[in-house]
Amino acid sequence: MTYQNFLAPMAFALSLTVAGAASTQTLTMGVRGGPESIDPHFSALGPHAEAAKHIFDTLVWSGIDLQIEPGLATSWKPVDDDTWEFKLRKGVKFHDGSDFNAEDVKFSIERIPVVTGPTTTAIYVRRVASVDIIDPHTIHIHTDGQAATLPNDFIRLFIVSSEAAADFSTLETASAGFNSGAAAIGTGPYKYVSWEPKGDLVLERFDGYWRGMGDWEKVIRKEIPNDSSRLAALKAGQVDVINYVSSVDYLALAKDTNIDSVKGDSVYIMNLQLDQRENTPLVRALDGSDLDENPFRDLRVRQAIDHAIDRETMVDIVLEGLGKPANQMMPPGFFGSSEKIPMPEYNPAKSKKLLADAGYSEGFEVDLYCTGDRLPGDAAICQGLGQMLTQVGIRTNVNAISKTVYFPAQARLDYSMFMNGWGTLTGEASYTLGGLAHSNNPEVKLGAYNRIEYENSDVDRLLQTGARMMDATARRATYEEAMEKVMEDKAYISIVQLQTVWGAKAGMLQFTPRFDEDTLAFFMKSAR
């Protein structure tokens, strides 16, 4: 076995031909979010990894439909129950002219747990016990038992230069070393020039890139969080392409002959998450007094919330059609998604009865938190949820805040009810269920993103069993069963699968939208 595709075939492969007024040598991109640091190991958030892919390569590459493909590793295979062998690409150069080899892979794997931030990247190497260098282009990775999905995890294993980053591999030194450019030496298609946090990331083409030269000598990634401002910049010619066109602007943009737009399915599912602790901080009676217990620990309350959500309205009205109703935490066809899970019924009368049966006939009040600047429609979905829940008696105060505030607070377990998007970037369930639905257990390195203290011993058992199954058919069935149990518990309530729109100057570019929503300059070709 060399590499394996865990995805069912994906139908869409839309190609966008878009052209414009910018220089054929410079591409200016308007993006909703940017990196939190130039250190690729700091954050697992999508915008951070998207920016990192311009400078650094991953050991295994994730294709357009999230199929795994050779990257800096050309092939991989299990050699025994707890060892994988990876063959490394020869002739690859870092931006400083030094050779890429096995030392850099070993260094990067061992560095990640040391320097990761609160949105941890350690999940990508959680199964690694040790790394042996066999020769400059062969490594053996020893795991803590059978690890069938290790190559999938490595689509986010960014490789840094062991020499350039040697002095910048502690929490205290990492960001400064990379942000200054001293350690920002990758093998990717572009070289680091400068970065202004929350502003411009300026890149220069690396002519020695192993995939070949890109079309653009210079790339400027402008971080423009506001959707209207980003679109205005495109219309004014200040940028050549933008991501995350809002649902409000999409229909009008489609009629604009000066701008080309394309829509693609997204890997991201919006999930409502309900705190399962005995005492939760942001729930109270309608008169402001404390409740005797956390209502979200009662399954009837969680079911009531699920039945209060009108997913069709959320897609058709709130998102202007840019989405699909979701019934589980991964898109259909992904490895471990289950066809047995029904789409939840919108039934507000049933919601009210369930609340009354649980002892909350008068309802209660809760603060709902979400991001307002990360994924398309996040704030609008959050507002829609607030209205729907309030209508059945759960008075909901919506707080759509910056992702830079939201995620650290989520990691501190500050919230009682919160919503954010989760993308199954590896295309298979161990990533999503292992991160979110397993109890938070550092000993087995699962549940790192379980911020609600959800725990189901059957789910834990299934996920631990599935993680060690090399037989794909048996593993799929195990993950499907785990998904069914998680969605039945309703501590996680999936709402919609997003769809994403890009806009660009008419006739300037050719590119195919990616399922993970990444906007990557190297794969945007000049149409001229």
Task: Walk through the language-model features, giving the residues of each.
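N-terminal signal peptide c-region/cleavage motif recognized by signal peptidases
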Residues: 16-19
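N-terminal lobe/hinge region of extracytoplasmic solute-binding protein
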Residues: 30-80, 110, 183-189
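Boundary of Sec targeting at the N-terminus
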Residues: 22-25
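Extracytoplasmic/periplasmic ligand-capture domains
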Residues: 64, 77, 89-120, 130-132, ...
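A generic structural motif
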Residues: 84-87, 137-143, 201
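Long beta-strand-rich cores associated with HINT superfamily self-processing modules
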Residues: 502-528
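Surface-exposed binding/hinge segments that line
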Residues: 77, 123-169
